[in-house]
């Protein structure tokens, strides 16, 4: 007979704890939603500013040109100075894969939610196919430059012995070293990805301004792209500080910028191209007035 009140009190306490935890979860979800909304709005406003995008180009140029000077003021034994560090292996070496995955999801959601048309969505996604072709083509061109400008050397205790082997493949097969002009493919790829992601993400400001559907999944994907863009900037700075020769880095960044200009700055504005980011997604002002 005495157990009844005890059991009832235990059940009441458990119910109060569950209610308290449920309320706490709802508060945390509300805070997370508010932060997601606020963060995506502010990031979209920053990336959508034409003035800030021009300053961003100047920032990338300053990083590549003046960043190597920081090597005299940083610890050469830091983890980022090692070719085998986690970020270099997992992110830099697969930079295009990360960029294509994150940015592909963002472009897919933005274009399809704005137009509901598969053909238009596929056209905008084809910019990533062009980007992959640019990446592969540039990599092959860099190897060709290294082959044409290089010579074969055998490392000896006294120094290097020059060999007459005609090409890189036969030189490496013989266990020797091939030394030529090596354009920094990492600097090229990170520069190209930074410019490409900034250009694509800038569309989100106009997307929000037109009142198009922007739920939590889309905002989260957008912020993930912003975080990846920030990571690419940081890893580009680490690359120019710790790795490669100065001219190799500058040439790599220059080629990446030129590739961006040929595509986003020129070709994508033509009617026979994949189209520039945001092209055909939003109604023009005069068409809105005519409809009204």
Swiss-Prot record:
Residues 40-54, 116-141, 209-220, 271-292 are cytoplasmic. It comes from the Eukaryota. The chain crosses the membrane at residues 19-39, 55-75, 95-115, 142-162, 188-208, 221-241, 250-270. GO terms for molecular function: coenzyme A diphosphatase activity; diacylglycerol binding; triglyceride binding. Keywords: Endoplasmic reticulum, Lipid metabolism, Membrane, Transmembrane, Transmembrane helix. The active site is at residues 186, 244. The record marks 248 as: Important for catalytic activity. PANTHER family: ACYL-COENZYME A DIPHOSPHATASE FITM2, FAT STORAGE-INDUCING TRANSMEMBRANE PROTEIN 1. Belongs to the FIT family. FIT1 subfamily. Plays an important role in the formation of lipid droplets (LDs) which are storage organelles at the center of lipid and energy homeostasis. Directly binds to diacylglycerol (DAGs) and triacylglycerol. This is Fat storage-inducing transmembrane protein 1. The gene is FITM1.
């Amino acid at each position: 007979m005495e157990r009844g009140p005890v059991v009832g009190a235990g059940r009441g306490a458990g119910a109060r704890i569950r209610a308290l935890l449920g309320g706490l979860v709802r508060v945390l979800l509300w805070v997370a939603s508010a932060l997601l909304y606020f963060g995506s709005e502010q990031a979209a406003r920053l990336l959508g500013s034409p003035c800030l995008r021009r300053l961003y180009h100047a920032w990338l140029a300053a990083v590549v040109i003046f960043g190597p000077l920081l090597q005299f003021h940083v610890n050469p034994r830091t983890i980022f100075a090692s070719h085998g560090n986690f970020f270099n292996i997992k992110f830099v070496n697969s930079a295009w894969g990360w960029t294509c995955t994150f940015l592909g999801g963002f472009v897919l959601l933005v274009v399809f939610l704005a137009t509901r048309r598969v053909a238009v969505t596929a056209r905008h996604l084809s910019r990533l196919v062009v980007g992959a072709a640019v990446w592969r083509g540039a990599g092959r061109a860099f190897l060709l430059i290294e082959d044409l400008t290089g010579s074969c050397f055998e490392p000896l205790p006294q120094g290097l012995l020059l060999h007459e082997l005609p090409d890189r493949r036969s030189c490496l097969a013989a266990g020797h070293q091939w030394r030529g002009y090596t354009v920094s493919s990492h600097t090229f790829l990170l520069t190209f990805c930074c410019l490409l992601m900034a250009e694509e993400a800038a569309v989100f400001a106009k997307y929000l301004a037109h009142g198009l559907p922007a739920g939590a999944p889309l905002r989260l994907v957008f912020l993930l792209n912003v975080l990846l863009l920030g990571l690419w900037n940081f890893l580009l700075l680490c690359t120019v500080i710790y790795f490669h020769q100065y001219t190799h880095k500058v040439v790599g960044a220059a080629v990446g910028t030129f590739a961006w200009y040929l595509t986003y700055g020129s070709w994508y504005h033509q009617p026979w191209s994949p189209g520039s980011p945001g092209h055909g997604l939003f109604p023009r002002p005069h068409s809105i007035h005519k409809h009204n």
